[in-house]
Amino acid sequence: MRHWLRLIKYSLLHEIAKYKAEPWMPNIFTQKLLSPIFLIGCGRSGTTIMGKILSEHPNISYLFEPYHLWAAVDPRTDILNLYSIIDADLLMNESHYSWESQMRFNRLFLYGHKNKNILLEKTPLNAMRIGYLNALAPEAKFIHIVRDGIDVSLSIDRLASTNSYKIAGKPQFNQWWGVQNYKWTALSRDGAAAGYYPDEINQLQDNQGKGAYEWLVTLGEIERWREFLGNRLYEITYNQMTGNPAETLRNICQFLQVDISSNWIEKATKTILPARSTLGNTLQLPSGMCASFNLHQTQFNFPNRAIPL
């Protein structure tokens, strides 16, 4: 029954989004449009818990992984092929921008948030679409959460291998990699085209290695845009979030320029559990990926290390 309900939910949300994206909606130029905040990071890095906490702030309107809205803005964003079988793009930049997608983005994302000062959108893989997002919202800010790469790759491995999330009519749907593993097809294609270890991708044969590659490409895109974004980018580690949540939330509020509520922070910190020790977990990667992976681990003071294949 659940897999049928999911099919109905995804189809209905997408059709409503497409309807709202059309020009017959209210004139957006007479409305107050919010500058968005994008919460990004490789999946399984803590964006969900951070998004949930920030969503409870009275000044913040929150959109949780609105794939249906993005697919209505531009079908090429449908990297899981949730709504149609399409040759979607994972890495997206300003070349994907169009005036039509700008208008659809404004209608679906920026309009209609009554009594809110901030729009927070959380789709982790948007870390690989910063150029596209910047074209749509040149004043947008970004919050990036980064977590130990081995922890991330193991979490992706568990999710992709267990694959318990089913959708009716999509027998070849994988919870992490999408229909017929299309997300991996796009990641390996777009990652290679962007120069991310093109000669080593074919050596990745399991979900943990592929998850580590997604982590590497995500961090590579963050580094590529770091200087350009400047003070529009705020970065935290998963360990900072779990080890000192109160200070982390205060700093984020200052970055977002929203009020700091002691009651909200006290309530929020109770929902964040300390990170579990994962020292000793292993990961094997091709030599080039392995070297870059361990450099990032050192950069963020993560203890685990990959070893070369």
Regions found by a protein language model. Name each.
Residues 60, 140, 232-233:
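Short, conserved active-site loop motifs that form the nucleotide-linked donor/cofactor pocket
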Residues 48-51, 69-72, 127-130, 150-155, ...:
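Short catalytic/ligand-binding loop motif for oxyanion handling, primarily in non-cytosolic enzymes
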Residues 1-106, 113, 162-166, 171-173, ...:
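PAPS-dependent sulfotransferase catalytic core
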Residues 39-41, 119-122, 144-146, 235-238, ...:
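Short beta-strand segments
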Residues 104-130:
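Glycine-rich phosphate-binding loop used to anchor ATP phosphates in small-molecule kinases
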Residues 57, 137, 230:
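Acidic-histidine catalytic/liganding microenvironments
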Residues 122, 133-159, 252:
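Conserved phosphate-donor/acceptor-positioning beta-strand/loop module used by diverse small-molecule
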Residues 1-37, 165-175, 179-309:
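PAPS-dependent sulfotransferases, especially Golgi type II membrane carbohydrate sulfotransferases
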